[in-house]
Amino acid sequence: AASDVYKRQVLWHGLPVVALFIWGAFCITNNLWYDEAYSASMVSLSWKRLIYITATDDHSPFYYVLLKLFYHLCGGGTHFWALKLMSVLFMLGYMLLGKYYVEKLFDRKISVYFMLFSLLMPIFSVQAGNVRMYAVALFFLTLTGLSAYDIFREATHRKWIVFCIASICTVYCHTFALIQTFLFYMLFLAAILICRKKELVKGYFISGFTVAIVFSPWLAVTCRQFILRMRYDDGSVSELATLNSVMDYCKEWFSAVETPVSYTHLTL
């Protein structure tokens, strides 16, 4: 029993360090694939141009703003390691959530399992070196989920604030993260109602309305992008999208039609 506790202690302290070394290796390169090159090009734009392009052709500018600030903080230039490093740091932050927050909510054993299986997932190694917003979204969505469970156990104003801020950051990361946050809020509401946690209802709706209000300016942009893409897919420039085009657009969210087979097997 004592040896098991010692091993768990070593893993609890060592896994984030191992993750940093493994994932950090992926940022020591100047190679970029197409989407990463797009992110790099956005960083090179002026602030006004960056906002304009994201409003017409992309997700919200939240990730690109963070990336641009971090890139210039690291000195800028033509080397792209700083772009990848930001993803590595957010993945490390995700691991630290597993180390400290999961331990607080559950115990050290669960914390070790959380970090170990996260480290063993190949897709996490991919995203750690990916100059895209997925590592950022993973961090904030995980913080949203953990803080929600923390609130469910014992609510405080501070926890609600953390939950609300994490939710806002998540919905501004990526359109798919927005959908995931919405579904999570529905799940959280169901848990509150089923377990009859009436004292949480007020805080839940205050948080939900706050997130909705803060995101509302970009929600209009997202809806416009949604309609424009469906019109483009239908070959129409004037008519509203049909139900079939809506269903065709949503297939990316809930099917593996455009997902690599290897990743599909991984998620299953």
Regions found by a protein language model. Name each.
Residues 12-106, 111-266:
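Membrane-proximal helix-loop-helix interfaces that form the catalytic/acceptor-binding platform
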Residues 1-9, 264-268:
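Conserved small/polar residues in nucleotide/adenosyl-binding loops
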